[in-house]
């Protein structure tokens, strides 16, 4: 005889077996034990929490109860204002010393040589040369010197020579 098809279906949906009182009590005890284990470990605040993470090189863990060692002022202290030091200005050179520095300036000489050779300078270089040449002119006027001193002397000598020739000396 063939088993009926209804029996095969009932095997899959068979009722769950009822638990005994002892099994129910054991499960309740397990749940209670799990519930007690929730949360942080006892004393975790005083112990410093997890010691595994953090500093690797230190042997003794740092006690979190110990605070900062920086002193705290207890009274009202007057504010100490820091005095700003003025930017040190370049030492003032005498006009003669400054003129000598400008005349021996290698960059200025190189740029002037390039100008004499017919090269065109960049705008930045040209403005720098103009500023330096203007400063040289100012210093020479201050000192009572001029570029044309040598040329004037030569012209004066030529005129004197001409005068001598005309006089017949």
Curated annotation (Swiss-Prot):
One of its GO terms (molecular function) is GTPase activator activity. Residues 49-58 have a biased composition (Polar residues). Keywords: GTPase activation, Ribosome biogenesis. It comes from the Bacteria. InterPro entries: YihI (IPR007336). Residues 10-19, 31-40 have a biased composition (Basic residues). One of its GO terms (biological process) is ribosome biogenesis. Residues 1-99, 146-169 are annotated as: Disordered. Residues 20-30, 160-169 have a biased composition (Basic and acidic residues). Residues 147-159 have a biased composition (Acidic residues). NCBIfam families: PRK05244.1-1. A GTPase-activating protein (GAP) that modifies Der/EngA GTPase function. May play a role in ribosome biogenesis. Interacts with Der. Belongs to the YihI family. This is Der GTPase-activating protein YihI. It comes from Escherichia coli O45:K1 (strain S88 / ExPEC).
């Amino acid at each position: 005889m063939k088993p009926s098809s209804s029996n095969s279906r009932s095997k899959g949906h068979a009722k769950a077996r009822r638990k005994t009182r002892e099994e129910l009590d054991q499960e309740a005890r397990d749940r209670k034990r799990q519930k007690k284990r929730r949360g942080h470990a006892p004393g975790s605040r005083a112990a410093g929490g997890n010691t595994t993470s953090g500093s690797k090189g230190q042997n003794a863990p740092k006690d979190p109860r110990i605070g900062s060692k920086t002193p705290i002022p207890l009274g009202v202290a007057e504010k100490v204002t820091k005095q700003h030091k003025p930017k040190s200005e370049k030492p003032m050179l005498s006009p003669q010393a400054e003129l000598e520095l400008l005349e021996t300036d290698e960059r200025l000489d190189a740029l002037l040589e390039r100008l004499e050779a017919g090269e065109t300078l960049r705008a930045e270089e040209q403005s720098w040369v103009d500023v330096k040449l203007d400063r040289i002119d100012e210093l020479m006027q201050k000192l009572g010197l001029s570029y044309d001193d040598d040329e004037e002397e030569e012209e004066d000598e030529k005129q004197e020579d001409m005068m001598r020739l005309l006089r017949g000396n």
